[in-house]
């Protein structure tokens, strides 16, 4: 099992990244929360990972924190939620926001994540209740990397999460100018939930 990778970030192409660890390039899918908190290409990075072996593929998923990985592991245990859907959920909300939504039984908020309908959201509440803990302080490992055009990056992230261009552009209007991309995505998603 590959539990953690430490090396040089050599490629960033949402939602995939490549980390060079002693001459071996590891390709991993990451949540948008993690992606926008990665350092620039060429810098050192550390990710917690989850390797999923299927009949047709070996898939590696990367996370900024051990807590995010733990949440991912709980999500993929829920019936109807696969690895890609779990990653989409963690792109739409932080692990703490997910834990809070489950604790509050907020089906509407959960079903706003891409690929999650009302029934799956209800199943998430039932199966995850008591298993996720919200933390008031998150332990991010990376400094936020400023984007050249944050608005475009936020819109493209929302499009990657399955929202329409109209919804994405409307949601970005409520994000204050100068907000970094990671925080901008969170604020835009909150605007979409209103």
Swiss-Prot record:
Q: Where do the record's region annotations for Domain II lie?
A: 65-143
Report the subcellular localization: Cytoplasm
Q: Which GO terms describe its molecular function?
A: ATP binding; four-way junction DNA binding; four-way junction helicase activity
Q: Which SUPFAM superfamilies match?
A: DNA helicase RuvA subunit, C-terminal domain (SSF46929), Nucleic acid-binding proteins (SSF50249), RuvA domain 2-like (SSF47781)
Q: Which family does it belong to?
A: Belongs to the RuvA family.
Assembly and binders = Homotetramer. Forms an RuvA(8)-RuvB(12)-Holliday junction (HJ) complex. HJ DNA is sandwiched between 2 RuvA tetramers; dsDNA enters through RuvA and exits via RuvB. An RuvB hexamer assembles on each DNA strand where it exits the tetramer. Each RuvB hexamer is contacted by two RuvA subunits (via domain III) on 2 adjacent RuvB subunits; this complex drives branch migration. In the full resolvosome a probable DNA-RuvA(4)-RuvB(12)-RuvC(2) complex forms which resolves the HJ.
What name has this protein been given in UniProt?
A: Holliday junction branch migration complex subunit RuvA
Which gene produces this protein?
ruvA
